[in-house]
Amino acid sequence: MRDRISAFLEEKQGLSVNSKQSYKYDLEQFLDMVGERISETSLKIYQAQLANLKISAQKRKISACNQFLYFLYQKGEVDSFYRLELAKQAEKKTEKPEILYLDSFWQESDHPEGRLLALLILEMGLLPSEILAIKVADINLDFQVLRISKASQQRIVTIPTALLSELEPLMGQTYLFERGEKPYSRQWAFRQLESFVKEKGFPSLSAQVLREQFILRQIENKVDLYEIAKKLGLKTVLTLEKYR
């Protein structure tokens, strides 16, 4: 089973050397505890061992292990899609949401539409409804800006450099996400997003949580709350105060 760690990491082409080392350490420790035969019982024992760690460390290890477990399930190495959960008592101790390790979102996916939706929310803080309404005419790749129109209001947001290559192939369309030159429905968007986050080992992530991750990353980068509110199209910073 230990050799599957290398195979798992080989599929994560977008990870840095340090990130791969972190994954390798966590997964080797995981296999040391659960042994060669993964079962509900061995996973419960492993979860119990994590209880004394900091919440951030627990979340990191659980995230890495869940991605690895999903990889094993996809490859037919295990007969069920096992999944670790953060202990309820640990969840209650968490006063503020924490930044999740989502580097895997930049890697290739069998759900490219869901991947792009996730990246637009995570990197720009956009709502699914805003994304579905985006027309290619609203995008200027040269100046790295996007015009968001909502009701009678408009705002201009900066497109991160990393997203330019993701958007460029779609510039010949009418809408960013379309079928027959018409935008997809919200239900379609949520299905695509759901399939993508499940593929990456984060089945509980929603558009709301990804938008929250955008906010947390902005705050970590010392961006002013008023500037964050402007990027999100919020009229006040009241809903952002809890993230201080």
Curated annotation (Swiss-Prot):
<comment type="similarity">
    <text>Belongs to the 'phage' integrase family. XerD-like subfamily.</text>
</comment>
<dbReference type="GO" id="GO:0006313">
    <property type="term" value="P:DNA transposition"/>
</dbReference>
<dbReference type="Pfam" id="PF02899">
    <property type="entry name" value="Phage_int_SAM_1"/>
</dbReference>
<keyword id="KW-0238">DNA-binding</keyword>
<dbReference type="GO" id="GO:0007059">
    <property type="term" value="P:chromosome segregation"/>
</dbReference>
<dbReference type="Pfam" id="PF00589">
    <property type="entry name" value="Phage_integrase"/>
</dbReference>
<dbReference type="GO" id="GO:0048476">
    <property type="term" value="C:Holliday junction resolvase complex"/>
</dbReference>
<dbReference type="InterPro" id="IPR010998">
    <property type="entry name" value="Integrase_recombinase_N"/>
</dbReference>
<dbReference type="InterPro" id="IPR044068">
    <property type="entry name" value="CB"/>
</dbReference>
<dbReference type="GO" id="GO:0006310">
    <property type="term" value="P:DNA recombination"/>
</dbReference>
<dbReference type="InterPro" id="IPR013762">
    <property type="entry name" value="Integrase-like_cat_sf"/>
</dbReference>
<feature type="active site">
    <location>
        <position position="150"/>
    </location>
</feature>
<keyword id="KW-0963">Cytoplasm</keyword>
<feature type="domain" description="Tyr recombinase">
    <location>
        <begin position="90"/>
        <end position="244"/>
    </location>
</feature>
<keyword id="KW-0229">DNA integration</keyword>
<feature type="active site">
    <location>
        <position position="211"/>
    </location>
</feature>
<dbReference type="GO" id="GO:0009037">
    <property type="term" value="F:tyrosine-based site-specific recombinase activity"/>
</dbReference>
<comment type="function">
    <text>Putative tyrosine recombinase. Not involved in the cutting and rejoining of the recombining DNA molecules on dif(SL) site.</text>
</comment>
<protein>
    <recommendedName>
        <fullName>Tyrosine recombinase XerD-like</fullName>
    </recommendedName>
</protein>
<feature type="active site" description="O-(3'-phospho-DNA)-tyrosine intermediate">
    <location>
        <position position="243"/>
    </location>
</feature>
<dbReference type="GO" id="GO:0003677">
    <property type="term" value="F:DNA binding"/>
</dbReference>
<dbReference type="GO" id="GO:0005737">
    <property type="term" value="C:cytoplasm"/>
</dbReference>
<keyword id="KW-0233">DNA recombination</keyword>
<dbReference type="InterPro" id="IPR011010">
    <property type="entry name" value="DNA_brk_join_enz"/>
</dbReference>
<dbReference type="InterPro" id="IPR002104">
    <property type="entry name" value="Integrase_catalytic"/>
</dbReference>
<dbReference type="InterPro" id="IPR020876">
    <property type="entry name" value="Tyrosine_recombinase_XerD-like"/>
</dbReference>
<dbReference type="InterPro" id="IPR004107">
    <property type="entry name" value="Integrase_SAM-like_N"/>
</dbReference>
<feature type="domain" description="Core-binding (CB)">
    <location>
        <begin position="1"/>
        <end position="73"/>
    </location>
</feature>
<dbReference type="GO" id="GO:0071139">
    <property type="term" value="P:resolution of DNA recombination intermediates"/>
</dbReference>
